[in-house]
Amino acid sequence: MKIGFIGCGNMASAMISGMLKKGLYKKDEIIVSNLTEEGSKRSREKLGVVTTLDNHEVVKNTKLVFLAVKPQFYEEVLNEVKDELTPEHTVVGIAPGKTLAWLEEKCGQPLKVVRMMPNTPAQVGEGMTGVCANEKVSAEELAQICEITDSFGRTEVVPERLMDAVSAVSGCSPAYVFMFIEAMADAAVAQGMPRKQAYQFAAQALLGSAKMVLETGMHPGELKDMVCSPAGSTIEGVRILEQNGFRSAVFEALNGAAEKLSLIHI
């Protein structure tokens, strides 16, 4: 079965790269539409997939269609292609705030609809994607979607009511992690370390720590305690972070992001 993407920006490119690396699809089984010939040329050169400037061609030639345009263009695109959509199609939205009900309504007929929220680490094969689907999507079809998202990271199926939480803890949080890495590196530079080297130490520390959580199954608090020797330097750093509201700031940032996302539901 062929697969289609309407739009092929950074996220779609990351998704397609993962599928190709995992061998889920061949290059000639993936068709993408771009707004310009320049964009089509980039997609062909970077990914080697079939390209077109016509969104209708994507829908006519595939049964699994990913909407990979910016959120503000979703309605325009769906209005353009809805006459070509059939009950055999599955439409997948990857934008925050576009609910399953809204997507199905804009498709103009009862259809299989999926929402997913990938994040930018998908670009290096370490994405985290939350997925939900309407009742028309079978378990087998949902498993196929999850196989695709697993090709560029990890996947969790969640009820739609949790998609804002997914967006906050997974979609938004890379920005906060990058801020933390930058702050750690700044501190190392203040201690005399060259900046490039400081970024390596800070980023690898976060990468390794995250892998410990995922691969050991241990509670993050337990892993933290393993590093904190009595009266040592690490527990002193923990004390200062707590004194300055580190945990509370993270909590409020994620809650604030989720609340903001809830305001754009349509």
Feature map (PLM): residue ranges:
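NAD(P)+-binding Rossmann beta1-loop-alpha1 motif at the extreme N-terminus of oxidoreductases
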Residues: 1-46, 50-53, 189-191
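Rossmann-like NAD(P)(H) cofactor-binding subdomain of soluble oxidoreductases
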Residues: 37, 46-47, 55-60, 64-131, ...
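Internal alpha-helical scaffold of NAD(P)-dependent oxidoreductase catalytic cores
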Residues: 102-112, 128-165, 178-215
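A short glycine-threonine-serine/GTX helix/turn-capping micro-motif
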Residues: 166-175, 196, 224
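Conserved small/polar residues in nucleotide/adenosyl-binding loops
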Residues: 264-266
